[in-house]
Amino acid sequence: LLAAIDASRHTTLARFLYALGIQHVGESTAKALAQWLGDLGLIRHLPWPLFRRIPDIGGEVARALGHFFDQPGNQAVIDRLLERGVRIGDSHAPDPRLGPTLDLASLLADLEIPKITPVRAAQLASAFNAQALVDAPLHNLVTAGLPTETAGALVGWLDAPGNAALLLRSADAQARVRGLLPAATAVATGPLEGMTVVLTG
């Protein structure tokens, strides 16, 4: 399929992503990525937790995507195809429905940190930004309302190689995606939209 794309020089984003042969990424997942994120230049540089914001993409698939795009050899293949003139004809801005889901609470839950449930993630997000959370000593986490055992699990996770950097990189990526979201183009219509109302009495 990659050879066919290379020969035709023109393709869709979903077809291109599927052709890359990423583990666990079938046609439906490739279509979802294309629909929700819209641009190869964005997708190929996202850390894996961001992929969990796409409907029906769980941790295993998100990690497979992140692992694929983290490999310099895979990025080089993409670069070569683009340099040879392959063009993706249906790129677009990310789906605006992503906006409300791109927050620190969602990110902390998506990172699969031990003992950090969605409720605890929301609790942390109300007290810290990403950098402050990385810098927070255990007693500050407890003061923010976490049980000592949960705070200890978070500190242990942050101390593991690469995890703090992943959190900060993912928070930056959230901000980047939010900045690419299109402004709302339509105002929701009310139940009386288009109707004539006559008030009497």
Regions found by a protein language model. Give the residues of each.
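DNA strand-break repair and replication-stress modules
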Residues: L1-G201
